[in-house]
Amino acid sequence: MKIKHILLGALMTVIAAPAIAQVEKDEVKEQVIAILKSGAEDKHKQVSSLAKEFKKDAAKLASVGKAYLAEKDYENAKKYAAMAVKANSKSAEGFILAGNIAVALDDAGDAATQFQQAMYADPKNPNGYRRYAQMMSKASPQDAVNALEALRQQRPDYPVDLIAAEIYSDAGKMDLAIQYYDKVSINDMKDYQISDYATNLFLSQNFDKSLSIATQGHSKFPRNASFNRLMMFNNTEKKDFAAAIAAGERLFTASDSAKISSFDYGYYGRALEGADKYQEAIGIYEQMLQADNVKADEKLEVNKKISDCYKKVSNYAKAEEYLNKYIQGHPQSSFSLEESVAELYADQLSDDKTPAAQKQASYEKADALYAALGQKYPDNAAYVANKRAQMPFSLAIDQKAQLKLAGPHYIEFANIMAAKSNRSAGETKMLINAYNAATAYYVHVADDMEKAKEVATKVIEIDPENENAKAILSLK
């Protein structure tokens, strides 16, 4: 299956769990926030007194500024950022705080400068590199990763590859994200990173490897919805429907905090259909119709899926019911939409479960519908004539009776195709077959040998060695 580009963002949102950063406890920041929220008239004075206790500690001064930033008091946040830089110009903390303030004020240029200053001030501190990379990840993923590669030179122990993978993934550069994820052991990844890795592989249509990564993730986090989802998706694409169904059951019934999406319903339904479990598939599609988070246009398509499933189990009444819902949901009609009803009746002719008497009624209905389609859509007249010619041969009647019903439509098809100046080789072959059927009709039904030979002559003009035409022309 080729996944359309416009679906990538939606699929990524559905599959991958959000990254949750681990935040270290900052006691100074928490203490200052408590003071600021107290409503005391002298709250700023209290903070100032506290800050004097560590006036030469850049990290703690920056923590005071972080508290002001959290309260959106940008002027005081800037004040403590400057104090942190003054206390120790070789510490990255004051510059990082200044960069974060600039980000909050939508000043990307100043933010970039401050984070770069942090890198220069303390090359071993990863936070300046990381904040710069995060800020640049959308505008210039390559610059972001270049900063991380510079960090690698300073801190070989730091998980640069994982961060780079996440940056490229967020930027939609799946191949580069995969390259960086490939460098990291699964054991060194958190659950959301394993999920993101497998998701990028899935969206790149590397279903085997995506399944392998998702399976490893599932073994570590068996109730993680993302891994059950990815196992269902990948196994469905690989047509291992039994495994896909098992994963689908876990996703729907044995996953923590699973938010079921339209993609989940769709893939689970596909897997059930692939395993010929049409009634179960109908049940899933019915759930999809009731789901609040499924869009109206998606629900419209589900009606067609349900109709197809009912057709597979020979429940044509239900198939027509849902097919009509599907058709009625389209504001404009079309040949293909209207033909789908005729096709539904035509399909009953080749279904062994359809009683002979019902086949006759279905044939008459299908033939009438195709006749109306031919009148309404003259550009499709040849197609319609050919369909009407083929249907009688599925009826439980003798060959002459079949030919009596089919013959006029073969003649109509042949007349249309013969007048076509730019026939393809395939169409010419269809024309010859129609002519041969017409000769049989004239010989065995109409008892008109002259007409049969006239048609046979036309065949010889196209195909001089045609044995059927030669045989007709040799008759006395």
Segment roles from a protein language model:
Residues 452-458:
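Low-complexity, intrinsically disordered Gly/Pro/Thr-rich segments
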